[in-house]
Amino acid sequence: MADYHPNATYVEAMSAILMQFIVPTAGEDDLIDVCVNQLVETYLFDGLKENEAARIVNAQLELHRSGLSADDRSNWLRTKVDILPSELKERTFAMLAHRVYFASEGRLDGEAADILDRAAKLLGLSSPRSEKIIEVCEVLTCPIA
């Protein structure tokens, strides 16, 4: 039996939330591989062992791509959000915002803005707080020249 890291519950919740917004439910295997690898690398930084991080991310991916109804998916996601303390809700939003900005080459179009708005609401972040996080992500993805 694998060792259970104390952060694993938070990692499961963060993965579920991030996947909801950045991973398509079907197809686009290259994009999915990139997202999964990024999440695993992030959780290694948090102190999880690689096999534990990969197991969590893959389990969340499998559930994300399952045939859950919209209501079941919403309830499942809400339970994940409720697990997270406020600082991890902010971190999850920052990870998503950085990914959205990076994927859109530092531009925030209507679709990207909608994703971030829905994520901020789901995570219960105030408008000023989510806007500040978005500003930081904008600076981080801005070209030097």
List the model feature ranges, each with a label:
Residues 1-145:
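Small-residue-enriched hydrophobic alpha-helices in membranes
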